[in-house]
Each structure stands twice: as C-alpha cells, then as structure tokens.
C-alpha cells in the first residue's frame, strides 16, 4: 500500500533486463526456426496454418498495445499513465510483424483456398481475394499502424526529454484520429487473414469477435508485464498502487464479459437463422474431434476468467490476477487455433511439437523486440502532465 502522497517521481530509466531473459528469447526464436523448417519437411500445409495462428496472435498483441495506448490518450485517462509505457512497448513488435508477413505470402497457397485459383463468379470478390491485392493492403495496414505508433508514442518519448505539455495534446489528437483508422483496418486484416479461410462464409460480427479476443488478451498481457515490473522493488514499485492493479483487473473482467457476449451473439444468430452458407462454419468446428476444443473455449475465455475475477479482492491479488492472465493467453491461442485449423484440416489431430515450437519462435521474436523497447526508453513517462495524478491514484483503496 502507498499511503503517502507522491510529490516527486525519480526517473527509473530504461528497464535493466537480466541477460537470461534475452538468452531465453534467442533460444525460443531458434526453436521456432528449427520447428518451422522441420514442420515444412513433415507437413507443409499444417506448418503454414500453424504459422498463421501464431502470427495473428502476436500481431494482435502488437496492435493491441498501440490501441490501448491511443485509447487512454483519446479519453484523457490519468490513472493509466503509470502503465502507459508498458502498453506502448508492445507496438515495438509491429515492424517485425511486417517482415513476418512475408511468410504469409510464401505460404499463401497452403493457407488460403482462394490463392490456388479462381473460386468465385463475382468479379469484385475475385479481385478482392487475389494474393497481390491482399498482400498489398495488409502490409499497407501494418505500415499505417507503425506510422501511428511512431507519431503517438514518439510524442511521449520526446516529452521525456523536453517536458513540453503540448506534446500530450498532439498525442491526444493523433490518438483520436487513429480510432476510426484502427476500426476499419483491423476489420480488413481480420477478414483477410481469418475469415477468408472459408471464402464463401461470412459473419457481420466476425471483426468484433476478433477485436474482443484481441483486447481481452492484450490487456491481460499488459497486466502481466505491469505486475512483473512492480514486484520485488521493480521499476514501477514506487508508483504502482493497488488501485492500478484493481483497474487493470476490472478491464480484464469487463472484456471477458464483452468477449462472451459477442461470441454467444455470433453463434446464436447463425444457429437461429440456420442458413447453410452460415452454419458450415460451426459445423466444421464442432465435429470430428473439434467439438472438444469448441467446448473448451468457454472454459478458458469466460468461465475461469469470469468467476476467477468476480470478487473485488481477486482483482487486487497479484498472483491470482497473473494466473488468470495466463488462462486468457491459453484461451486466445486455442480460439485462434479453432478459427484457423478446421478450415483446412477436417479432423482434430494436433501435432503438439509443431504448434508449441512455432509459437515459441514468435514469442521469442516478440520478446526481443518488446524488451529492446523497454531497455532503450524509460519505463515511466515521468514528464507527462498527469504522471503525479496517476501515481497518487487511490480510488479503490
């Protein structure tokens, strides 16, 4: 508990990361590369599908960190300033995501049915789902995200040096501009990478569904890193309060409910309408062994996080909150896996070493890029005009 009013904050500087962490990230990256090469030799189709699962999960973390940062700027939230540099760091993965998209292009014929030849009579849809056009717009979208991250987070980093209050106003304006851009661009990339796996199927709720999963899991990741940085005299230990922990827990709880609402709404509407061109999506994903994963998703995405975070005390208990965050990560991976794999694999028959190995590769690259950001810049925006207000946040105590 922090009972005294904070009147001055020393700059903790960049994160000093133990060498074992960096070595862990390098090893994970190497494991991923070796696993991908071996997987391509064993089953190229499955390898590229697993690549897409891991790619989309970490892409969501990257843009999710940017979205969370921009959202807090846009609404002028002061309590979250202590955590802002944590969320900003996640966007450091976006340049790597742009490069890793080349893998999606290389494996496109193994991933997307429409990449193997014309599938549509509609000339507009035929042009929309052509590999050059899909790759061009998706990479352009990631470039746009990188540009907004450079502007919004760049203002905050410059403010660390100058203390210019007007930089906050500029960050707010750019964040507001980013909101509609994000909504449109994330919808497009969700359609291109996931919904187009079954090109004759569509859902008007699909982009909201992928957004809900993205935001729930991203806030869980932000919370996990934040709690790690504030424990054992970490760099955030002197400014982080139980109220920050409680508010992040409340965010997770709220978007667990939102995720469930959207997921149920999509299922209920398709089930009730009972139109063959829509029900095929769930038919593929609730038979031939996939039903077990279908039934597991509510457990990891709703039941465990919801009841685990239902009490006020649970949201402020750090070890418990960290455990819930891990459960949400597992749920997010299983959800994306369930969205991707049944489109090309009729029977649920996971190749565990392939899934874990390729995922570790992406986790390693993500860890290297994000930790590099934390190691270069201060983990606190100490000259932000709302910094002291955030450090004195005591709403839930």
Regions of interest found by a model, annotated:
Residues 18-34, 128-297, 384:
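Long, contiguous internal "core" modules enriched in hydrophobic/ aromatic residues
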């Amino acid at each position: 508990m922090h009972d005294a009013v904070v009147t001055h904050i020393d700059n903790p500087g960049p994160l000093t990361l133990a060498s074992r962490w960096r070595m862990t990230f390098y090893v994970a990256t190497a494991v991923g590369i070796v696993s991908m090469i071996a997987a391509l030799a064993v089953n190229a189709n499955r390898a590229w599908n697993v690549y897409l699962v891991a790619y989309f999960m970490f892409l969501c973390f990257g843009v999710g960190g940017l979205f969370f940062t921009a959202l807090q700027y846009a609404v002028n939230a002061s309590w979250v300033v202590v955590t802002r540099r944590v969320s900003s760091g996640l966007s450091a993965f976006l340049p790597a995501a742009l490069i890793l998209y080349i893998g999606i292009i290389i494996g496109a014929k193994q991933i997307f049915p429409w990449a193997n030849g014309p599938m549509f009579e509609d000339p507009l849809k035929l042009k929309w789902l052509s590999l050059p056009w899909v790759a061009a717009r998706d990479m352009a979208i990631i470039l746009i995200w990188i540009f907004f991250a450079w502007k919004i987070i760049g203002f905050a980093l410059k403010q660390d040096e100058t203390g210019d209050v007007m930089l906050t106003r500029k960050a707010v304006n750019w964040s507001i501009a980013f909101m509609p851009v994000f909504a449109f661009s994330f919808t497009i990339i969700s359609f291109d990478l996931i919904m187009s796996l079954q090109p004759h199927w569509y859902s008007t709720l699909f982009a909201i569904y992928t957004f809900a999963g993205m935001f729930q899991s991203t806030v869980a990741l932000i919370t996990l890193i934040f709690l790690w940085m504030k424990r054992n005299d970490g760099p955030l230990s002197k400014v982080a309060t139980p109220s920050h922990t409680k508010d992040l827990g409340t965010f997770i709880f709220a978007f667990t409910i939102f995720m469930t609402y959207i997921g149920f709404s999509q299922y209920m509407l398709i089930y009730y309408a009972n139109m063959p061109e829509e029900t095929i999506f769930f038919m593929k994903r609730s038979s031939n062994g996939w039903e077990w994963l279908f039934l597991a998703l509510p457990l990891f995405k709703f039941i465990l996080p919801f009841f685990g975070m239902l009490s006020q005390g649970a949201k402020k208990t750090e070890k418990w909150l960290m455990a819930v965050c891990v459960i949400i990560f597992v749920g997010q991976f299983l959800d994306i896996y369930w969205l991707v794999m049944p489109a090309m694999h009729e029977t649920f028959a996971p190749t565990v070493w392939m899934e874990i190995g390729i995922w570790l590769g992406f986790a390693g690259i993500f860890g290297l890029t994000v930790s590099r950001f934390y190691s270069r810049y201060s983990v606190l925006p100490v000259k932000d005009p709302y910094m002291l207000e955030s450090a004195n946040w005591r709403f839930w105590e």
